[in-house]
Structures are given as structure tokens and as C-alpha cells.
Amino acid sequence: MLLPGMAMVAGKVMMDRNAPPEVLDTPQQGYDDSKALIARWRGTGSQRYAITPRFAITSTPEQLAMAGQLAREHPDCHVQTHLSENRDEIDQTLSLYPQARDYLDIYDRYGLLGRRSLMGHAIHLTPR
């Protein structure tokens, strides 16, 4: 329960690889589940919905594309994910997305960056 003056931004975590099988979804399942939750919770008092691919390591290009589609369909929603927490993570991420110029570029390519984007960590960023 939210107290007066409080707000919450939350969303279903989307992961379709590199995670325990019991928490994996598919790109379509993540899209469908998120869309249903957006319909249920968007604009409900102080609650805001965040489209939430966990991070690029646990999302295939297909899942990030569907998350980007959700962001385009629902521009009032936030997008929340992780970015550049440590150097090993960055190396692994860039090995999965070799076309990206840096970690942030992955999210940009899939339409996940905008004024409502929330990036957890963002410690080791590449100067541009």
C-alpha cells in the first residue's frame, strides 16, 4: 500500500536467456504479460508502469525489440533496465551484441532510450 505522497514505478521483469529456466519467458510472453499489466496498472493513482527487460545479457535481440515495441505503443510508460554495472558485465554484453558501439547503444538500437528511461547502476559509461 502506498502512503500519501508516495509513488511507485514497477514492471514485470523480462528475461529469455542466461537465467534459471523457471524465471525465463519468451519474447512474446514477455510482451503479452507486460501489455496486460500495463492495461491493469497504468494510470492507477501514484503507480506507474515500467517496461522492464532485466538487462541485455538476459534478453535476446528479439525480446529487446518487443520491449521497444511496447515502449512505442505506450510512450507514457517508463523503461527500466540495468546498464554498465561492472566491466565483466560490459564485456559479456558486448560479446552478445557485437554490432553495438557501446552498452548504451544496444538499448538505443531497440528504441528503449527516452525521457522516461531509468538505467540502474550506469557506473562505467563510455564517453561520446
Regions from the language model: what does each represent?
Residues L2-I123:
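Metal-coordinating catalytic core of metallo-dependent amide/deamination hydrolases
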